[in-house]
């Protein structure tokens, strides 16, 4: 709808200039807001003010921005084909990175269905608790103990 705003937060790159030019040429400058080099404190505030989170990344080391958004209570639209599906779990919507119409449809789906958006965000929040430091540490400890026990048993044979 015409009251929807898009906030793009990231590094200032040559591509940023292309986005700014496209936005201006399509008379969207009043609804598309580009924020460069946002610090973590400001980023948390942006997440808190958002309705949902779109992450159209083709390549990603792990998908930390998705987890951050989910931890702030946001539902997520992200791309298929990288680690993002593992980072976000089944409650996020995933679209092929070249599917512009699919990305728009997924975003509209979340914007137009507040109950679904909230349910997806809650389920995603439950999913990402597995990545919290204390849970990861406990999982690593369990794996070490299992490995030690396996070694111990194999040495007895």
Region locations from a protein language model:
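Nucleotide-activated donor-binding/catalytic signature segment of Leloir-type glycosyltransferases, i.e.
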Residues: 17-44
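Short alpha-helical donor nucleotide-sugar binding micro-motif in glycosyltransferases
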Residues: 38, 45-50, 55
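Conserved acidic donor-binding segment of nucleotide-sugar-dependent glycosyltransferases
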Residues: 79, 93-100, 109-114
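C-terminal alpha-helical cap of glycosyltransferases
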Residues: 133-157
């Amino acid at each position: 709808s015409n009251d929807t705003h898009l906030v793009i937060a990231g590094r200032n790159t040559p591509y940023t200039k292309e986005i700014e030019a496209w936005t201006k040429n399509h008379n969207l400058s009043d609804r598309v807001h580009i924020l460069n080099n946002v610090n973590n404190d400001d980023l948390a505030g942006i997440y808190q003010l958002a309705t949902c989170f779109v992450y159209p990344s083709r390549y990603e080391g792990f998908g930390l921005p998705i987890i951050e958004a989910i931890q702030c209570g946001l539902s997520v639209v992200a791309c298929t084909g990288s680690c993002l599906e593992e980072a976000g779990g089944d409650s996020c919507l995933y679209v092929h990175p070249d599917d512009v119409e699919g990305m728009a449809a997924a975003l509209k789906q979340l914007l137009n269905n507040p109950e679904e958006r909230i349910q997806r965000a809650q389920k995603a929040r439950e999913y990402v608790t597995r990545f919290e430091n204390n849970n990861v540490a406990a999982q690593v400890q369990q794996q070490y103990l299992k490995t030690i026990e396996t070694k111990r048993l194999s040495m007895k044979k």
